[in-house]
């Protein structure tokens, strides 16, 4: 989990969701698990207290095979600032992919990395951002454009859709 200015309550929010849901998809341990190719998600979360998180995330694993979500996020103060952060992250998708592949993250290197060409957010993502009502989140897979719109606070069901197990 990386952010320019990680606050205690930010860390609590993410840790609470990840810890609550990380073991929820292991009900039948003897079934054969198939792993899908790496999916990198661009997201925006709107919380009840008016806070917004925008970021990029993917499932990752350490050298001994433990799986965990890797998240890099911003905490913008407005919708225009949210759009700026999303476009910036989308343009740095190759750098994010390299971080996942190499297993090393230096936040300054990420922010200073080269950007790719055009960054396009789906119309559905724009609609979510412009909708000022409600608590929820929007997740767009950056390669194929698949998306998930989730009402309410992040749930274990959403966690498993994004990160599997």
Describe each model-derived feature in a short phrase.
Residues 1-39:
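N-terminal ordered "arm"
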Residues 1, 5, 48-165:
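Long protein-protein interaction modules used by eukaryotic assembly/scaffold proteins
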Residues 25-60:
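Short, structured protein-protein interaction patches enriched in aromatics and acidic/basic residues
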Residues 10, 18-21, 45, 132, ...:
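Short, isolated positions within intrinsically disordered regulatory regions of eukaryotic proteins
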């Amino acid at each position: 989990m990386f952010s320019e200015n990680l606050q205690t309550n930010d860390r609590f929010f993410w840790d609470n969701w990840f810890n609550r849901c990380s073991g929820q998809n292991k009900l039948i341990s003897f079934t054969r698990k198939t792993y899908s190719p790496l999916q990198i998600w661009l997201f925006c979360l709107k919380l009840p207290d008016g806070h917004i998180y925008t970021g990029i995330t993917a499932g990752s694993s350490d050298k001994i095979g433990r799986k965990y979500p890797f998240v890099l996020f911003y905490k913008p103060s407005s919708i225009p600032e949210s759009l700026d952060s999303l476009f910036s992250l989308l343009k740095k998708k190759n750098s994010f992919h390299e971080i996942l592949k190499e297993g090393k993250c230096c936040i300054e290197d990420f922010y200073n990395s080269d950007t790719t060409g055009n960054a396009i957010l789906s119309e559905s993502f724009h609609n979510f951002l412009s909708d000022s009502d409600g608590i929820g989140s929007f997740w767009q897979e950056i390669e194929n454009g698949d998306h998930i719109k989730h009402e309410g606070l992040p749930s274990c069901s959403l966690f498993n859709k994004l990160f599997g197990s």
